[in-house]
Design a protein with these regions (language model features):
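Active-site-adjacent beta->alpha loops and helix N-cap segments on the catalytic face
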Residues: 1-4, 18-23, 42-59, 80-83, ...
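Short beta-strand/loop segments at the ligand-binding rim of alpha/beta enzyme cores
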Residues: 2-12, 60-76
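Glycine-enriched alpha-helix->loop->beta-strand junction motifs that scaffold or abut catalytic
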Residues: 2-10, 27-35, 87-92
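Active-site beta-loop-alpha junctions enriched in small/polar residues
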Residues: 12-16, 38-39, 74-80, 96-98
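Extended, intrinsically disordered, low-complexity segments
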Residues: 16, 114-127
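Catalytic cores of alpha/beta
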Residues: 17-28, 64-66, 70-91
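Glycine-rich phosphate-binding active-site loops on the catalytic face of alpha/beta enzymes
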Residues: 34-44, 87-107
Length: 127
């Protein structure tokens, strides 16, 4: 139904996804797959080193490469560690954005301007 309505369905992979399930997800996914870097709730602190996360990411990327799909990393990605993930197809920083919005509102600042500035800084760390 998603493709029929021009909606991209983003599926998730995690460190505990089995190879057989992973292949099914990769085959049925659209242009992008979200790799949940760790078992945690959103906004959690990074568990394990970026090197360990990228090791798992690269294993998945080898499987995906043949299908030309993007693999983005999320969970635990912050302004402090984002440059470690330069080699990924993309990084999800949802909790960082939510924190910036909350802080902006609390300080009676423009959240759109502050989020935009934060994203520019993050972009400069990975490009």
């Amino acid at each position: 139904k998603c493709k029929k309505n021009s909606i991209s369905f983003v599926q998730l992979l995690s460190p505990t996804t089995s190879i057989s399930r992973m292949k099914k997800i990769i085959n049925s996914s659209h242009e992008m797959i979200y790799y949940i870097s760790m078992l945690s709730t959103t906004g959690g602190k990074l568990k394990g080193s970026p090197r360990e996360i990228l090791k798992n990411y690269n294993k998945i990327k080898k499987i995906i490469k043949k299908r030309k799909k993007n693999l983005v990393i999320g969970f635990g990605i912050t302004s402090k560690n984002i440059s470690s993930f330069k080699s990924s197809d993309g990084c999800v920083v949802g909790s960082e954005i939510c924190k910036k919005i909350s802080k902006s509102i609390k300080n009676r600042q423009n959240p759109v301007t502050n989020v935009n500035n934060m994203l520019r800084k993050l972009k400069s760390k990975i490009l």
